[in-house]
Amino acid sequence: LKYIELSGNVGILANGAGLTMTTMDAVCYFGGTPANFLEIGGDAYTKGRDALEIVFSNPAVKSLLVNFCGAFARTDVMAQGLVQAWEELKPTLPIFFTIHGTGEEEAVKLVRERLGVEPFDLMDDAVIAAVEAAK
């Protein structure tokens, strides 16, 4: 896991450094401020619990934006780890997802059924919702 704490209030969790930076840029573009850079790419993409514990250690975080895009890394595996950790930790933060790529259908179904959250089709829509929720 690669983590850098920042001064904002929108928590960010994405797979891959480029996607994480793009997500941070989008948060800024839509008037928010990122609370962190947290990238779970490479062999860390199954470490959902560790990632959530890191995000939740920052009391400034008011919403969590998850952006998964998988080619080699399977989005269903990433979602499984994150959903399981979410159920164990029972946070009260609002969470917003975009999920695209390998295993997408299963990942979306998992997030819908177990978290009761509807993933966004477009990253911009998820970002706008996360920024609004953090206000």
Locations of regions flagged by a protein language model:
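ATP-dependent carboxylate/acyl-activation modules
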Residues: 1-66, 76-80, 84-88, 100-135
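A short helix->loop->beta-strand "cap" motif at the edges of active sites that frequently abuts
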Residues: 91-95
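Short glycine-centered, acidic/aromatic-flanked micro-motifs in structured strand/loop junctions
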Residues: 68-70
